Amino acid sequence: MRLKRWEIALLASLLAALLVCAFPLQVQSKLADKLTRLHVLANSDSEEDQALKLQVRDAVLAASAGQSVLDDTLLNKLEQAAQAEVLRRGYRYPVAVTRETCYFDTRVYETFSLPAGYYDAVRVVIGAGAGRNWWCVIYPPLCAGMCERDWETVAREAGLTEAEIGLICEAEGYVLRFQLVDWWGKLLHKLREI
C-alpha cells in the first residue's frame, strides 16, 4: 500500500511535533528528579487560616534550613515545627507532613519558573486542608526568603545542569516548550486518574 503525499506530510508533521516535545519533556523529567517541592495546604480559605498557612510555611522553612537529606527524621522535625506554630498561634488544627509524588501545574516564581509535571513533594496539610495552597522548592532551597545566596549558584551546587537552569530561568525562550510540557503533563495526569 502506497501512502499519498498528504499522508506522508501528516506523518512527518506528527514526527516533528513529537521530536519538538521530547526535549523539554526529558529535561522536565530529569529536573523533577533533582527537586523537592513544598506544598502547604491551609485548613480553609478564611483570612485567618490563610495567614496561619504562611506562618506555618515560615516555620517549616526555618526547620528545614541547612538540611540536605530529606528522611523520616526531618519529616518528623518539620511536622513538629508546623504543629508547634499552629498551637503557638492559638489554633487546635492537626498537622500532617508527608512525602508524596504530586502533579504541579507550571509555576512562575520571582526569579525562575518550573514546568508542569510530577515532582517529589513535602505536603503540609493543616486541619482539613481545604483551603488555598502555597508551594515552592524546598530542596535545593530556592524558596523566596529561604535562599540567602544567588539561586542559580544553589541550583548548580544541587546538581542542576545548565540546560535545566536555562529551562527554568529563561522565560521568553521556553514559553512554547512549557505549554507543550503542560499540555502533555495534563494529558498524562488525566489518563492516570481514569
Regions found by a protein language model. Give the residues of each.
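Extracellular glycan-modifying ectodomains
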Residues: 2-12, 162-194
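Charged, low-complexity intrinsically disordered segments
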Residues: 4, 9, 28, 84, ...
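Hydrophobic membrane-insertion alpha-helices, especially the h-region
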Residues: 7-24
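Aromatic-capped interface at the extracytoplasmic side
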Residues: 20-34
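Short extracytoplasmic
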Residues: 37-68
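Sec-exported extracytoplasmic/periplasmic mature domains
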Residues: 57-65, 83-91, 144
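Mid-length scaffold segments of soluble, non-membrane domains
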Residues: 73-137
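Soluble extracytoplasmic domains of inner/organellar membrane proteins
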Residues: 112-176
